Amino acid sequence: MAKVNLIESPYSLLQLKGIGPKKIEVLQQLNIHTVEDLVLYLPTRYEDNTVIDLNQAEDQSNVTIEGQVYTAPVVAFFGRNKSKLTVHLMVNNIAVKCIFFNQPYLKKKIELNQTITVKGKWNRVKQEITGNRVFFNSQGTQTQENADVQLEPVYRIKEGIKQKQIRDQIRQALNDVTIHEWLTDELREKYKLETLDFTLNTLHHPKSKEDLLRARRTYAFTELFLFELRMQWLNRLEKSSDEAIEIDYDLDQVKSFIDRLPFELTEAQKSSVNEIFRDLKAPIRMHRLLQGDVGSGKTVVAAICMYALKTAGYQSALMVPTEILAEQHAESLMALFGDSMNVALLTGSVKGKKRKILLEQLENGTIDCLIGTHALIQDDVIFHNVGLVITDEQHRFGVNQRQLLREKGAMTNVLFMTATPIPRTLAISVFGEMDVSSIKQLPKGRKPIITTWAKHEQYDKVLMQMTSELKKGRQAYVICPLIESSEHLEDVQNVVALYESLQQYYGVSRVGLLHGKLSADEKDEVMQKFSNHEIDVLVSTTVVEVGVNVPNATFMMIYDADRFGLSTLHQLRGRVGRSDQQSYCVLIASPKTETGIERMTIMTQTTDGFELSERDLEMRGPGDFFGVKQSGLPDFLVANLVEDYRMLEVARDEAAELIQSGVFFENTYQHLRHFVEENLLHRSFD
């Protein structure tokens, strides 16, 4: 089948007026290869040139005024090739002096009694405007040439093309293309949406703010609807090929294992276990996300599920992003299982004869549970009969890596875990095809971490507070954003310098250093020393963000904390507060921006990771929350997953109804179905 386009053009880009081979090269750099691409190349923002009442204008603000010329323009030259043009306008009975620097050619264009529109900076005291643009209009109404002066689209461009050129070329294209509707009449009427023809023309050349809002609303819904059609269709395909054997676990053995645990499960943990167990009994493969705040006990839930698989005669696999985390999981699971399960660890460090023996035991079924890094997805890693694959911090792996691990078993159930609570907005889009379990309770006995914010000049006081904790026999983390000093970030502390400073303060043997440039063995050695309390203070970059578990650590200092996002700060903070002892987190920062100040304030107000994740998403946007590449998020042109969340829910419901009812596969939707299938369905956002 040929590629289906919903925007069809009778000619190519080269046939547009003003586009030659050189312009084609520039357009291609902007990812514009066809006339359809050009029409869908939307503005990034709009210059608001709406004429305002000068009585309402703020001093030193950028304004647009319209008035009648009542003095002839005068040009004064000074310096080398510099000029100043002065002209006076009458604007609603207010005499305004207009100044234009280095635009002497305007003298020939500005005439007495002419009505012109000027955009520039307003000086209320002097009653003058320093103009940067002028629009000519002798009739007192906007000419066709300046019809879009009120709301002027601004595009992302590169050297070799100007704003006016791309606006003109898009206008040309819109005049001649055939635009097929993406939404049905029924949907448009139901939600009071515009036609795609009106929407695209308005987004490129808005006649009013009201029209622009209507067009933006329609295009945002269209983007979300097409995305959800893709998600729902993939979900249907996934489930149609997702036959699975029912995991016939021994419930009595599982209950006995839970009773032997040295602690009582929280209600949230029990609920999550029950949800997962229902999935394991179902005739289709499980796709579930288990999300919980730092220290909420996700690993225990995973352990119970692994044990259930063992009682049914199946193996389990747990893939984590780092060797340190893999080793910690292996250690904690071995302690939980004792002799009841054979747990093995496979990382890049396991080599030679040891690796060969491990792989043999895995293939013959001797190993019940395999824990490791991406080493688990290598071709020679063959399971006997894996029934459950668990991926921890799954957004840190690419889709391909997760798929390769899943394919280790023909009918494998999949559980994703994350300690980064995912805002419901992202959960519905990134993980739309999954069921979600959430653990929002902390284990009994845990005390909330006390978080404070200190400026750099208060560092000595923070050091005294940390010393007080160390004297109690506790341990501490000190986090820095950089490994070494940077000439570009001279005001940012680096981990090596702070490590050396703290060595002088506490003594060489009491302070350890951890960062990404160390080898795996070096990292393991440092972490082992910290875990064994051979060192008191661990100075580190964010490599300790995920999974590191040292219950005796009760103090964390995060230097230049404003350099991190809320989710990262919360993950770092979660390295303390892992026992019944009171823990502290001190943010050292002197933020220069409102956003930085807001982040520090929020961190001191709440320890709820779910609330923080929502705030982080609002502040940073979905693309930065995980990074578009990792998250699988499409790069929407108009829609915003935060602002348009309600619209996303509606789009999802409408798409689900179309797909699940089968109506989408009838002739009525043939054109749209072919478009989604050819352009979106198998497109990867990795």
From Swiss-Prot:
Positions occupied by motif DEAH box: 392-395
Known EC number: 5.6.2.4
Top-level taxon of origin: Bacteria
All residue ranges annotated as the Helicase C-terminal domain in the record: 462-618
Gene3D superfamilies xref list: Nucleic acid-binding proteins, P-loop containing nucleotide triphosphate hydrolases
Self-association and partners: Monomer.
Record bears the keyword Chloroplast: no
Catalytic activity line of the entry: Couples ATP hydrolysis with the unwinding of duplex DNA by translocating in the 3'-5' direction; ATP + H2O = ADP + phosphate + H(+)
Record: residues binding ATP: 292-299
Stored SMART domains: DEXDc (SM00487), HELICc (SM00490)
Function according to Swiss-Prot or TrEMBL: Plays a critical role in recombination and DNA repair. Helps process Holliday junction intermediates to mature products by catalyzing branch migration. Has replication fork regression activity, unwinds stalled or blocked replication forks to make a HJ that can be resolved. Has a DNA unwinding activity characteristic of a DNA helicase with 3'-5' polarity.
SUPFAM superfamilies hit by this protein: Nucleic acid-binding proteins, P-loop containing nucleoside triphosphate hydrolases
Similarity-based family: Belongs to the helicase family. RecG subfamily.
Gene that this sequence comes from: recG
Protein name: ATP-dependent DNA helicase RecG
GO biological process: one example: DNA repair
Pfam families: DEAD (PF00270), Helicase_C (PF00271), RecG_dom3_C (PF19833), RecG_wedge (PF17191)
Domain notes: The wedge domain within the N-terminus inserts into the replication fork junction, where the lagging and leading strand split.
Region described as Wedge domain: spans on this chain: 50-149
InterPro entries in the record: ATP-dep_DNA_helicase_RecG (IPR004609), DEAD/DEAH_box_helicase_dom (IPR011545), Helicase_ATP-bd (IPR014001), Helicase_C-like (IPR001650), NA-bd_OB-fold (IPR012340), P-loop_NTPase (IPR027417), RecG/Mfd (IPR047112), RecG_dom3_C (IPR045562)
Residues forming coiled coils: none
Keyword line: ATP-binding, DNA damage, DNA recombination, DNA repair, DNA-binding, Helicase, Hydrolase, Isomerase, Nucleotide-binding
CDD domains registered for this protein in UniProt: DEXHc_RecG, RecG_wedge_OBF
Domain Helicase ATP-binding residue range list: 279-439
GO MF term set: ATP binding; ATP hydrolysis activity; DNA binding; DNA helicase activity
